[in-house]
Amino acid sequence: MLTLLKNLECYAPEHIGKNDILICAGKIYKIAPRMDNAGCGLIESADDCDGLLAFPGLIDQHVHIAGGGGEQGFSSRTSEMDATDILAAGVTTVVGLLGADGTTRSLESLYAKAKALEEQGLTTYIY
């Protein structure tokens, strides 16, 4: 499936002006000014995005995706990160790591959480 987003103010990360973005299989395939979808039966949707901005996703290199804390005991633990909250901050790639709580959190649970976030559209690494 091809989707064409037209007339976006694009940053990559510097401002590159008004461009169209062609998306193929959920990934950005091409960014260029004034792409024409006439005569191309492969584009399923073309949306006018005039007035909207497009930025590259941010990378957060230190995230306790499986939760953190625990230095003062079990009541001081924080909950797992949610993909919605991560994406709302403009972050599309996270590097997950364990916190101080080595009793209830493990590399296995960190790996499982990273895979769950990938299923929700994020790119993840663990350390």
Q: Language-model segments: what does each one mean?
A:
Residues 1-3, 10-55:
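Histidine-rich, glycine-flanked metal-binding segment
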Residues 116-127:
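Metal-coordinating catalytic core of metallo-dependent amide/deamination hydrolases
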Residues 11, 110-118:
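A short, hydrophobic/aromatic-rich structural module that often spans a beta strand
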